[in-house]
Structure formats: structure tokens, C-alpha cells
């Protein structure tokens, strides 16, 4: 079994977006620690299967971020189940999970299901709109969400999502300082190696997504944050 707490860098691929075989090969052979498949819009059974089958040729961990029931399927090493803590809609806190458990609970391997305390912080992002996230939160709120993740729910991961813009690293640090057991993931707006280094200086794991499609060369450079130390 893979140890998620050793991951420093992961690429997130959107099944609704197009990526060439050449670029996918570069991503999967880049020494990233894992690939996450997930997105906000138009995530379907067909496009998840297609992308999964292409990535499965490579010997690295493959994760499905659960966004809807239709596209949830066997064949992944892990399933990330985001509990959007600052959502105003219970659907994105435990509603999707409830439906998944009703449908697949009898066959789930819960060692593969990783629950995340997920906090969305970019008010202009699609994910904030879809989940009805309250993004108007301060450092004290972030600290409380960290305690909620770590001490109340005891989720193994807190995921801070700025989706589309580079975030406030002081808020990420405030969350990190209030976690004892949970591992912190950061995603959002990483568009250069300098952004990647700044995020990696605070978060345990950085997630690089849109940059794969916007500038593959810059995306590949972000793997350098792993270093050789």
C-alpha cells in the first residue's frame, strides 16, 4: 500500500479536458508522486474510464477524487472523498458520500477511501459556486476548520483549495499549525516553480492541475520541489 504522507507533489488531471499521449507520458514519467483524476464539471463514467485506462499504463499511484456517483468506479488505488467543510449545501459535506454508501457500501474497501476536510477559498472558482462554499473566512475560521479536520472528524487529510488563483499562504500555514495528525494538501493557481516552492514550503503536498493544460513545460518544472535531499 502506498503511503500518502510521503507524497510531496501530485498532478491532478481533469477527465473533461484533453491531453495528448505525449503530454500524458511526460506527466506520468515526471517523478510526481501520484496522479489524481477529478474535476468540477462534466465528469462522467466514460471520460473517467478513458483517462484511467491511459494512466494505468504507468507505475504510479492513481487516485479518483469523488465528485459524483456516476463516475465512481473500481480500479483506483485510492478514492478521495472531499467533505467541503465550508459548503452551505449538505450535498457536498456528506450527501454524495451518503449516496455512494447506499450504492456501493457493501463492496467498498474502506482502506482505499480517504476522507478529506476540504476548504474552498476562491470565491470566483467553479468549485466554490457549485458547492455554495462560504469563502469569506478569516484565519480564525481556518484554524477552526483545521481542528475540526484533525480532532473532531479525524480525517487524514485537510485539503485547501484555491482553484484557479494562487492562495494566501499565511492561511495555509495557520491551518498547518493546528494539525497534529492530518496531512495538508494545497491546490490552486500554481503557475510556476516559484509558486510551487512557496506552496511546498507550507503544505505537505502540492497539487498541480490547470498548469498541465496551460503550460506543460512549467507544469513539469514544479516536480523539482521534491528535490533530492
Curated annotation (Swiss-Prot):
The keyword Lipid biosynthesis applies. It comes from Staphylococcus carnosus (strain TM300). The keyword Ubl conjugation does not apply. It holds the Pfam family PcrB. Pathway: Membrane lipid metabolism; glycerophospholipid metabolism. Sn-glycerol 1-phosphate binds at residues 12, 159-164, 189, 209-210. GO terms for biological process: glycerophospholipid biosynthetic process. InterPro entries: GGGP/HepGP_synthase_I, GGGP/HepGP_synthase_sf, GGGP_HepGP_synthase. Its EC number is 2.5.1.n9. NCBIfam families: GGGP-family, PRK04169.1-1, PRK04169.1-3, PRK04169.1-4. Its cofactor is Mg(2+). It catalyses: sn-glycerol 1-phosphate + all-trans-heptaprenyl diphosphate = 3-heptaprenyl-sn-glycero-1-phosphate + diphosphate. Prenyltransferase that catalyzes in vivo the transfer of the heptaprenyl moiety of heptaprenyl pyrophosphate (HepPP; 35 carbon atoms) to the C3 hydroxyl of sn-glycerol-1-phosphate (G1P), producing heptaprenylglyceryl phosphate (HepGP). This reaction is an ether-bond-formation step in the biosynthesis of archaea-type G1P-based membrane lipids found in Bacillales. It comes from the Bacteria. Mg(2+) binds at residues 14, 40. This is Heptaprenylglyceryl phosphate synthase. Homodimer.
Amino acid at each position: 500500500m502506498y503511503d500518502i504522507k510521503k507524497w510531496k507533489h501530485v498532478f491532478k488531471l481533469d477527465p473533461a479536458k484533453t491531453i495528448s499521449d505525449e503530454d500524458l507520458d511526460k506527466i506520468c514519467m515526471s517523478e510526481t508522486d501520484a496522479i489524481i483524476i477529478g474535476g468540477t464539471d462534466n465528469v462522467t463514467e466514460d471520460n473517467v474510464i478513458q483517462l484511467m485506462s491511459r494512466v494505468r499504463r504507468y507505475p504510479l499511484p492513481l487516485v479518483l477524487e469523488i465528485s459524483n456517483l456516476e463516475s465512481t468506479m473500481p480500479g483506483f488505488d485510492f478514492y478521495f472523498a472531499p467533505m467541503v467543510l465550508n459548503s452551505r449545501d449538505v450535498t457536498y459535506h456528506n450527501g454524495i458520500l451518503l449516496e455512494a454508501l447506499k450504492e456501493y457500501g457493501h463492496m467498498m474497501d474502506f482502506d482505499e477511501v480517504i476522507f478529506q476536510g476540504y476548504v474552498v477559498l476562491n470565491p470566483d472558482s467553479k468549485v466554490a459556486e457549485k458547492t455554495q462554499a462560504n469563502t469569506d473566512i478569516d484565519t480564525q475560521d481556518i484554524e477552526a476548520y483545521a481542528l475540526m479536520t484533525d480532532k473532531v472528524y479525524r480525517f487524514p487529510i485537510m485539503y485547501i483549495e484555491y482553484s484557479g488563483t494562487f492562495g494566501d499562504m499565511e492561511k495555509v500555514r495557520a491551518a498547518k499549525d493546528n494539525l497534529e495528525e492530518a496531512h495538508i494538501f494545497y491546490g490552486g493557481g500554481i503557475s510556476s516553480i516559484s509558486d510551487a516552492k512557496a506552496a511546498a514550503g507550507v503544505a505537505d503536498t502540492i497539487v498541480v492541475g490547470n498548469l498541465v493544460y496551460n503550460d506543460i513545460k512549467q507544469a513539469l518544472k514544479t516536480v523539482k520541489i521534491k528535490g533530492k535531499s
